[in-house]
């Protein structure tokens, strides 16, 4: 609805802008907090969510689950978590994010304790995820670490993000990766859901 790029807004200014559009999105809409990684700004996130809840705004958090703590306080006012899975293995997660996957597990443990709803998203990178072995591992990972799942989605990896890495002059872990074909991604999702819906496939 509005572009916050290149500007710094305090929480009052953000809430004011959102309030101006409340008649537009009504009872069925709300606010999605994304990034970057919103969990890396816990104090701001906590303050903003408290103010949004006072005006009864539905709040979704789009996150990779990798932050710096205060998860319980953040999640108290979150209605829905849109979880972006980077990878399920410790080594590849480290290579792609330069972070530790255990931090994601910590976030998920607290979210599950609070019975938060999840939409789970997996971006499919052909070189990394387009194989049966990964699908089986992903099924086990989801069933082990994530509860109260409302929906699972596969998204095809694209190269649009390369420009962002170049602009910010930071290393791009996906630089040599190919884009994912949409039809192949859809077929892979169908194959995954057969595994996921098989009651005997859980760990």
Residue ranges and their predicted role:
Residues 15-160:
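Conserved AdoMet/S-adenosylmethionine-binding subsite of the radical SAM
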Residues 1, 32, 91, 172-175:
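A general structural-boundary detector
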């Amino acid at each position: 609805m509005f572009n916050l790029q290149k500007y710094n807004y305090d929480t009052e200014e953000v809430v004011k802008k959102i309030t101006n559009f409340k008649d537009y999105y009504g009872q069925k809409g709300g606010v999605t907090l994304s990034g970057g990684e919103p969990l890396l700004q816990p104090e701001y996130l906590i303050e903003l969510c408290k103010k949004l809840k006072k005006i009864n705004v539905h709040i979704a958090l789009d996150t990779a689950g990798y932050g710096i703590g205060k998860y319980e306080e953040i999640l108290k006012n979150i209605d829905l978590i849109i979880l972006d899975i980077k990878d399920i293995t410790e080594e590849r997660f480290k290579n792609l994010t330069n972070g530790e996957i255990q931090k994601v597990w910590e976030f998920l443990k607290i979210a599950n304790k609070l019975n938060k709803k999840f939409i789970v998203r997996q971006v499919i990178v052909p070189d990394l995820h387009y194989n049966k072995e990964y699908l089986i591992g992903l099924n086990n990972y989801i069933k082990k670490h994530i509860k109260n799942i409302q929906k699972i989605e596969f998204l095809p990896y694209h190269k649009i993000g390369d420009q962002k890495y170049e602009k910010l002059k930071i290393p791009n872990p996906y630089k040599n990766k190919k884009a994912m074909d949409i039809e192949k991604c859809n077929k892979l999702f169908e194959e995954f859901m057969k595994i996921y819906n098989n009651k005997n496939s859980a760990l």
